[in-house]
Amino acid sequence: MTPHTKEKLHGDLPSASSKAASADRKELAAIAFERTRMPMVVTDGRKPDLPIVLANKAFLELTGYPAQEVLGRNCRFLQGPATSPIAVAEIRAAIAGEREVSVEILNYKKSGEQFWNRLHLSPVHGDDGKILYFFGSQIDMTEYRRIEALEASEHRLLMEVDHRSKNVLAIVDSIVRLSNADDPALYAAAIQHRVQALARAHTLLAARGWTNISLEELIRQQVTPFAATRAIFNGPDINMPAPVVQPLALVLHELAVNAAHHGALAVAQGRLSISWKPRPSGAGFYIRWQEVGAPTPPKLAKRGFGTVIVGAMVEKQLKGRLQKIWSDEGLLIDIEIPSAGPTCA
């Protein structure tokens, strides 16, 4: 509704006189205002605080206020702690300029419940162009907002699933490419065991909601089946980001398999000690894998495929560092893992 324009209803009502028709039209307009399902209010634009002078049934039902608690008050009683000051300022500017405005604003019902309100405010001017009233209609957008948020959440979930799937596929691709294919039966068994290690890690991730994964829990999960009571675990509570878990699970699996077949766990007197600690920066962690009593490999021993996979997971997937040292006591492996997750490239 523009200034200096007096809106009229289109059409006419049959009546014995123009005066009666005018009265009928006013009565019909009042009935329509009251019975429409759209919440509506009218405020007095000539008074200082723009008090509400009319409020229909739909408005009272939406807000939960009785008529006596609405009439005579400014509409700001619907505002609350989380109402946007920007939206409020936009409404005030439109009132000051006597112009139409549509604003989506967070309002509060009498019960304290929040609802999203799409407010359309229109000025009503007299024949002389002066402001008489402001007419406000509302649409409850709460359910729409809820659905919108669900759709956004679903989209984020799909993106996260896509990202996680790419990470897992990258790891599986590494397993397939780096496993020894000389003997088909051994090749199939090695891949199966490595994928099972990933599956156990995935189960742990799912159980923890893909957040706050305990480093100790992962280490014990992957190592205990091979070490039983012959492993010592020592370190503080450290939680890992989810992208680190599956590549690290494969690293631990390979180290445990090697220890069981060729290292300290392959001999009666051998012992395995695994310790961990946070990096000085607080981001990421160190793992020390120590095998005491492990047989020293021949100097010209061929680099095993498990070693290749461990190196690929630590250095390429996790962007970490690995150092292996043989001594008279046995094998010492130091692993450094930064906080960032793996890449899929």
From Swiss-Prot:
Disruption phenotype: Mutant produces similar amounts of exopolysaccharides and shows no significant differences in the biofilm biomass between light and dark conditions. Mutant also forms a higher number of white nodules compared with the wild-type, independently of the illumination conditions.
Xref: InterPro entries: HATPase_C_sf, PAC, PAS, PAS-assoc_C, PAS-like_dom_sf, Sig_transdc_His_kinase_HWE
Species: Rhizobium johnstonii (strain DSM 114642 / LMG 32736 / 3841) (Rhizobium leguminosarum bv. viciae)
Taxonomic lineage: Bacteria, Pseudomonadati, Pseudomonadota, Alphaproteobacteria, Hyphomicrobiales
Region of interest: HWE histidine kinase domain: 160-236
S-4a-FMN cysteine carried by residues: 75
Name listed for the protein in its UniProt record: Blue-light-activated histidine kinase
Compositional bias ranges of the Basic and acidic residues kind: 1-11
Entry EC number(s): 2.7.13.3
Catalytic activity: ATP + protein L-histidine = ADP + protein N-phospho-L-histidine
Name of the encoding gene: lov
